[in-house]
Amino acid sequence: MTANTPKRLLALDILRGITIAGMILVNNPGSWGHVYTPLEHAAFNGLTPTDLVFPFFMFIMGISTYISLRKYNFTYSHATLRKIVKRTVVIFCIGLFLNLLAKSVFTHHLNFEELRYLGVMQRLAIGYGVTSLVAITVKHKYFPAIILVTLAVYFLLLAMGDGFNLSATNIVARFDVWALGTSHMYHDGGMAFDPEGLLSTLPAVCHVMVGFYCGKLLFSAKDNDEKIQRLFLVGTILTFAGFLLSYGCPINKKVWSPTFVITTCGLASSFLALLIWIIDIKGYQGWCVFFRSFGVNPLFIYVFAEIMGILLGATGASVFIYEKVLVTVLGNYPGSLAYALLYVLFCWSIVHILYKKGIYVKI
């Protein structure tokens, strides 16, 4: 016996599509040396628009996880466990494949010796897997307490372990070096410091858990008006708390600080409420087609964009298009942005064909 599937919210697809389009945009400039400031990540402490796209997607993944597990009444069974483990492993392995491809195409051999173990897809996999397992084994009313305790413990680790300085003594870097080894980590300015490392995945899981709990609030509401009221309330409280606490705990994406989790979850909740009001209540949907095409096939198009980006870079095609065409016409910075926008349009043309044909690639 399964529960009724909740009515699909178009706003959720659109927010998912906006974040995926944003991830593709910021990951594929024509030149990393010519990127406008809002499209760059904060150097360390701080928050830019670019810093929002990944945590927004993790928040949305939490809501999607709620919808998915609701069909099974959130009950533990071998079938549900197999589904969770299978999806977790598949997403994680796709991330490993992307890292191996990126390393191998430039060294011209299968480079396992310097294979980066973690990354965006791996973080998504762990966030989904842990949240799903907790959701089918623990009462959902305990989610806020689990999130708060996790973030509090992580803050203590950062505070006592030089966690708010970008240095080799940072506890996040030290733990990851110990657990993964420097040859299997991302290197930031020559230093082994992985922004999707193992220790910082602990608070990142909280992003998915907050999204999951917001999914519970969403689909237990009696109508769309109550949905946006709940989301705006949660969003306002979290955003205010995040910025207030940032005076003692800096907002920092690289270490995924507790205030980064709280603030970005608050902003994501508020933005989703705004989209529900615009799209699902007011019915202003004419502009949605572009982002919906991304939103219904999110992981597929993200993986496609990563693979194509690697191949374009390895063959020199991206450099040729940027330097010989776009820079000549537009200049360095506008040309770099134009390349990223054209790449987003290229990816959209692929995923829009799938959308029009009703093809949804599930990972």
Report residues per predicted region.
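Alpha-helical transmembrane segments and their immediate juxtamembrane cytosolic regions
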Residues: 1-363
